[in-house]
Amino acid sequence: MILVMSKPLPLSGSEPNYTQRLWGRTVGVGNNNCYAYAVGDYEKMRLQKSVPGERAGIRNLSHTYTNCKGLPQRVIADNPKKVYTAKATEKCKPNHFKVMMFVAPGNQRNYFRQGDFHFYKQHGAVEYKVKKGNTYENIAKFFKVR
């Protein structure tokens, strides 16, 4: 499925600001993945990547995470008071923000293309630390602004 957005998704006003202070450091990047980031499940030490259903104790022996079957229910089970399903184009309830899940089915016969999942989190604003040598042009390029 290809999703083409012609206008920004509505904000609830509760979206967190994007910052690299915690999640963007070596410990944050090395021990957390997109799912942990999307639902705010930061850990300083994690032996394996966080997957939907893990916190709720749902066994994942038969799920490949390359299709959507049962994944929304697993996310809700992991985060019962924080998550509910909504349409991308509607504003979230107060104190909530959008998280979107995507899966890539991959090719089971190709070891390097077995598929995976990815989560995106909607932010209301971005905290950007200007670095020495930054120009208006490369900052605009970073934010994809013309």
Feature names for model-found ranges:
Residues 126-146:
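Primarily a LysM-type cell-wall glycan-binding module
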Residues 2-82:
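Cysteine-nucleophile protease catalytic domains, especially the papain-like/related folds used
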Residues 63-125:
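...with weaker cross-activation on analogous glycine-rich loops/strands in unrelated enzymes
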Residues 46-48, 124-125, 129:
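Short amphipathic alpha-helical segments with coiled-coil-like heptad repeat character
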